[in-house]
């Protein structure tokens, strides 16, 4: 969205406004027909280089999540090209996705949780050893990057509905894929076709690595970048696609 925000610092500050707004009020949600006051909580991907910036933008509690570089962009590179993960801030609760296995129609992974829910106990920093819980996740959402989305959702639903992480995680098997997001087109053909809405360099870096990893043959990519919005991303997207795919078709 740099065509609107003009530069990264402005974009990052505007995003941080979401965290700053947490200090203004708690949320009032209608749950089971009743209005319930839900304490505000921030949720952040700890693999984001700006994670500490967002955390510092609010006085409210922030719960994080990470795969320690095992999914998305961080998992795409190895050796000297490996992405350096930012240091996890002290005294922040977070969950870690591990053993991520993505297949054609879904994924499974385990999660180590700091605590049993997103609720922060009083004097949390002084509580040692901290209580942990392990979850086993299965979902009909292909793509290892969805481990991020699932963990963020578990934290959010736990906070809003006042449910434990395990209660929320038990429902992930019922999740329905969103059309246009890693949608598999199966008409009996001898090859696999996937449709995804990815339209930015970061999303390309997220979806191509897991597909490349499990692709046994050649990988083709068909995409375009119509309109006159962000023209600077076009060559970057082409470079990323060319890195992971055998043939790239520009529409």
Question: Which residues fall in each region the model found?
Answer:
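Active-site beta-alpha connecting loops in nucleotide-dependent enzymes
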Residues: 177-180, 202, 209-251
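Alpha-helical elements of the RecA-like P-loop NTPase motor core of helicases
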Residues: 52, 202-205
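Short glycine-centered, acidic/aromatic-flanked micro-motifs in structured strand/loop junctions
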Residues: 139, 197, 223-225
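Conserved cofactor-binding/catalytic machinery of classical short-chain dehydrogenase/reductase
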Residues: 152, 199, 203
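Hydrophobic side chains in well-ordered alpha-helices
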Residues: 168, 204-207
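Short glycine-rich anion-binding loops that position phosphate/pyrophosphate groups of nucleotides
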Residues: 1, 48-49, 200, 225-228
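Switch II (G3) loop of P-loop NTPases
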Residues: 193-199
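Acidic, Mg2+-coordinating active-site environments of NTP-dependent enzymes
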Residues: 1-192, 216
């Amino acid at each position: 969205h740099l065509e609107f925000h003009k530069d990264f610092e402005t974009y990052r500050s505007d995003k941080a406004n979401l965290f700053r707004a947490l200090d203004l009020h708690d949320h009032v949600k209608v749950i089971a027909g009743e209005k319930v006051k839900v304490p505000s909580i921030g949720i952040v991907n700890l693999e984001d280089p700006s994670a500490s910036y967002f955390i510092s933008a609010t006085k409210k509690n922030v719960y994080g999540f990470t795969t320690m570089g095992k999914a998305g962009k961080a998992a795409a590179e190895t050796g000297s090209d490996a992405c350096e993960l930012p240091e996890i801030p002290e005294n922040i609760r977070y969950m870690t996705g591990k053993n991520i296995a993505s297949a054609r129609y879904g994924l499974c992974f385990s999660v180590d949780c700091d605590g049993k829910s997103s609720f922060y106990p009083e004097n949390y920093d002084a509580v040692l050893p901290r209580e942990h819980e392990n979850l086993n996740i299965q979902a009909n959402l292909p793509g290892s990057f969805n481990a991020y989305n699932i963990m963020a959702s578990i934290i959010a639903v736990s906070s809003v509905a006042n449910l434990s992480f395990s209660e929320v995680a038990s429902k992930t098997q019922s999740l329905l894929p969103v059309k246009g997001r890693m949608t598999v087109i199966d008409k009996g053909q001898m090859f696999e076709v996937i449709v995804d809405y990815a339209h930015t360099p970061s999303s390309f870096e997220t979806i191509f690595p897991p597909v490349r990893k499990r692709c046994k043959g050649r990988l083709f990519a068909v995409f375009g970048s119509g309109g006159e919005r962000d023209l600077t991303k076009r060559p970057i997207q082409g470079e990323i696609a060319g890195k992971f795919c055998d043939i790239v078709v520009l529409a």
